[in-house]
């Protein structure tokens, strides 16, 4: 029996664990198993006992399901291209990369246009920063709120106590 190694790749929703068998099988009864290499054992994963007898040493091992990171990188870089494909030789691996904008904003040489979307209204800063609230605003209603007459309040409490 070989060594079992558990590879753990964290994802957003769950943890994916894939197991690989590494090393030759230690079965003294079967002489074929002692001569097998770790690559033969990897190629035999997922095969039935009948299929294990016919192992191609150049066959690739089964590939695990892609993780979230590989899916994200494929979305950014596009599908992988074959080396013998004519279009793959014409383009660089950096053609599909997106350059993020700096957190400090665009550089002075790359100023954004004053009206980026055609027909959209331009948001302008206020003309003066110390401006008065317009008339008939909520601030005016605060001024119209009458002051509480504490003397009347006290008399109402005293009337309740006496029972009048």
UniProtKB/Swiss-Prot annotation:
Region (Disordered): 46-142
Protein name: Uncharacterized protein ZK353.3
Organism: Caenorhabditis elegans
